[in-house]
Amino acid sequence: TIDDFNFKCCIGKNGISKKKREGDKKTPAGTFEIENLYYRPDRIKKPPTKLKCIKIKKNMGWCNDIRFPKKYNKLIKIEKNIKYEKLNRKDYKYDLLIPIKYNSKKPIIGLGSCIFIHLTKDYKPTAGCVALKEKDFLIMLKLIKKSTKIKIF
């Protein structure tokens, strides 16, 4: 809910948890800051928003590799030997993407990574993210700013 808008969304396949762990398919419970908007300029024009907008490039990933503590749960340039979530996906889900600042300031290895607000068409459960239909995502973008927080409960 933002102002008077209620948005239907989908969450992690295994529900919401205060004890989120890497790969558990749970959405973390709590109140979190949000990051910048990442978008696919080859598919969507830059949407109106007060968030900083970053174009997704082919070499962009989000590190989920517990072997690399300095890169874990951060935006990275894709490297061969590092596990990552590719931002430039073949499907539509990351055409619009906002990272949720969960386990991000001083990431604890294994506590979970790659928690995003992204797109869905069918409300199928996610691997731990929050997903909205594109029309709702675009409305949300007009209402939020850098100081907006997401409450997951």
Model-derived regions: residue spans:
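Cell wall/extracellular polymer interaction/catalysis modules
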Residues: 1-127, 134-153
